[in-house]
Amino acid sequence: MTITASLVKELRQRTSAGMMDCKQALTETNGDMEAAIDLMRTSGAAKATRKAGRITIEGLVKVNISADKKTVTILEVNSETDFVTKGDVFIGFVDMLGTLALKTTPINIEEFLSQTLDNGDSLEKAREDIIAKVGENIAIRRVQTITTNNGVIGTYKHGERIAVVTVLEGGDEVLAKDIAMHIAASKPECISEAELSTDLLEREKAIFVKQAKESEKPDNFIEKIIVGRMKKFVNEITLYGQYFVKDPDTTIGKLVQSNNAQVKSFVRFEVGEGIEKKEENFADEVMAQIQGANTD
């Protein structure tokens, strides 16, 4: 049977799979549309296995909050390219995961990945189906549940790549959201100096001492230099020490104090942070794509 362009188009519309994958499935099933769909679903797991080694550095973050605003889940799902992240298939998958996370409130990614969907499929099976549809490796990278009984929760998303959740004691939702926005922009490592390790502070101080002594300035002046640099270092990496992005004349520490509030915790997710992207030259990249098309 001749595999027409209209058959390939129909199969693509029904499966969201690539053109060559659709044509191959129709060829193997002699143009039987339903058999081709079954074949593509069956081969999905095998394709997912082959794609599993590919680096996923693009993606989306998703935040879901309960009706009573006492529970929030935040998750990151990755793909290989930003092209896939803009597609309805991937966006729908991430939306489904966000709903599932809020429903199950997992304590870690391992617990989340062990969940079963309403249709009886495992989450891994659902992931493999998405991989078969979009033709890229998909990774459900991380998830976190944040709960509070009496605190105030604030959330902020910068586009689809950065998401922040803050929990305040005192204050209100406007303040909580403002602080979440600040965290998105300024990336503090912790709330206050009390959370910094002694090892980190001593290591930084040793560096500053060495630099100051190399300046050959008087000892009393060197001490002032070290104190000043340590204070600047601490302020730059702690939330309370940072200057508020909406009002550079005040620090976050002073802001929460003036509102009779405290920051109890925060979570910041940024797509791809900590993932090393493999460097490839253009020729290697083209060859890899050709080889990938041949094996898929």
UniProtKB/Swiss-Prot annotation:
<dbReference type="InterPro" id="IPR014039">
    <property type="entry name" value="Transl_elong_EFTs/EF1B_dimer"/>
</dbReference>
<comment type="function">
    <text>Associates with the EF-Tu.GDP complex and induces the exchange of GDP to GTP. It remains bound to the aminoacyl-tRNA.EF-Tu.GTP complex up to the GTP hydrolysis stage on the ribosome.</text>
</comment>
<keyword id="KW-0963">Cytoplasm</keyword>
<dbReference type="GO" id="GO:0005737">
    <property type="term" value="C:cytoplasm"/>
</dbReference>
<dbReference type="Pfam" id="PF00889">
    <property type="entry name" value="EF_TS"/>
</dbReference>
<dbReference type="InterPro" id="IPR018101">
    <property type="entry name" value="Transl_elong_Ts_CS"/>
</dbReference>
<keyword id="KW-0251">Elongation factor</keyword>
<keyword id="KW-0648">Protein biosynthesis</keyword>
<dbReference type="InterPro" id="IPR009060">
    <property type="entry name" value="UBA-like_sf"/>
</dbReference>
<protein>
    <recommendedName>
        <fullName>Elongation factor Ts</fullName>
    </recommendedName>
</protein>
<dbReference type="InterPro" id="IPR036402">
    <property type="entry name" value="EF-Ts_dimer_sf"/>
</dbReference>
<comment type="similarity">
    <text>Belongs to the EF-Ts family.</text>
</comment>
<dbReference type="GO" id="GO:0003746">
    <property type="term" value="F:translation elongation factor activity"/>
</dbReference>
<feature type="region of interest" description="Involved in Mg(2+) ion dislocation from EF-Tu">
    <location>
        <begin position="81"/>
        <end position="84"/>
    </location>
</feature>
<dbReference type="InterPro" id="IPR001816">
    <property type="entry name" value="Transl_elong_EFTs/EF1B"/>
</dbReference>
